Amino acid sequence: SGNTAKALAMLSAARGYEFTAIVDKHAPADKLNSIRAYGGKLHFCTDEQDKEGGHLVDVRRETARRLAKENNGINLDQYDNPENPRGYYTTLGKEIDKSVPDADYLVGTIGTGSSLSGTGLYLKENNNEIKVIALEPKGSSHFSPHGHGYFISGPGYPAGAVLPKNINRDIIDVHDYVADKEAFNTMRFFAEKKGLLVGDSSAMTLYYAMKFVRENPVSEKIKKIVLIIGDSGESYLSHAFSDSWMIEKELLDENISKELSEFYI
C-alpha cells in the first residue's frame, strides 16, 4: 500500500541511502508523492506482469528480490522478515504493557500481520487474560480464500497471493471484517468532527471498537480495550477525503457518521 515505503524513504533520506520502492498503480497517489518527496525512486510493476507471472503482490515481491540482487542492495521483505514483528514485540508491545498491563482486548488490523503479531505476542506473554482481535477489509483473504476487491489500501491481502509468514495466527483470538464504506466514512467523521486525520487502518479499529462495545455492553469482563491507531490520513487525501472519489465509488454514507456521532460524543 505504500506505508512502509514512505517510512523507509524518510529513513533513507536521513541516513543517505538510495531507496527504491516497488509499487503498482493501485497505491494511493498521495503515498507515492511522499516517497518521491523524500528522494525515493519508484519502480512500477504492471497489471500485464500480474497476468503473466502470478498475482501482482507476488510479482512485486519477486521484483524486489531481483532488483536487490542486481544492484547490490537489501530487500527488507516486510512480508516474511521476522525482524518486522520482532520490532513491534520489543517496542510497542512493551509500551502498551507498561501503560495498560491489565488490558482485556487488543484490536488491530492485519496486512503483513507484523504489527499485531509482534505486539500481541508480547502482551499475551505478560497478560494471560488479554484477547487479540484481528481485523481485515471485507474482501481480504487472510482467513478465507474467497476474497474479492476492496478499496482499503493499508491492511488486507488480496485473494490468490502467497500469504505472509509474519502473521502469527496462534495469538489471534477473534477475526473480523470492516467494509470500505465503514472505514472511509469513519475517516471523514474523525476529521470533520474530532479534528483527527486518521488513515484507513486506524478507522477500521475505531469503527470496530464502537461495534464491539455496542454488541458487548461494558461489564466486569470488558474494562479496557487497546486500539492500534497505526496510520495518518494525510496519505488518503485524494480518495477517502475526496467527495468526488467517494461519490464515484458509491461509498458516502451519512448513516455511519450519525452512528459514530452517537457513540464518540
Where do the PLM segments sit?
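Active-site-adjacent helical/loop segments in soluble small-molecule enzymes
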Residues: 167-220
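Conserved PLP-anchoring active-site segment centered on the Schiff-base-forming lysine
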Residues: 1, 16-29, 221, 225-229
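Short beta-strand segments
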Residues: 22, 77-78, 109-110, 134-136, ...
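Small/polar-residue-rich loop-to-helix segments that shape phosphate-bearing ligand pockets
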Residues: 20-105, 137-185, 191, 264
